[in-house]
């Protein structure tokens, strides 16, 4: 994962990309690099880990987590089912000898939850921190504001469902 743009021949891989190659070909200088992830103005790579058969990617899309499973070779990406939108989700651990993974997911309207699943399948909550308030009437919306230089800045508004106010 280059921290600065990386030129290989005539190809430039942007900083923050995740590249894959065959180990022996890479050492010999003959590898063809595959782009597994390439950042854009809305998305950055937060974390990644290998299970036995898959690569698990955690990206931030407009500051909200997206967790995907990548199949080696084709490098096709598929979202992991069972993770709510507008959350912060991190990899806790993966099984390098199997396809088990553990994630920690939390949001503005629910406490930290430990999730378990198999890469490529749906995740299941196995433990949760206690809730310190009733969030059944809480609504979370994501909005954007344009900065002076034209950059779209994401932000969240958290409030009671249907409430009116300066932020709505």
Describe the role of every protein-language-model region.
Residues 1-3, 7, 18, 31-40, ...:
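Non-catalytic accessory segments flanking enzyme active sites
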Residues 21-27:
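Short helix-loop-beta junction
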Residues 11-15:
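Short coil-to-beta strand junction motifs in C2/discoidin
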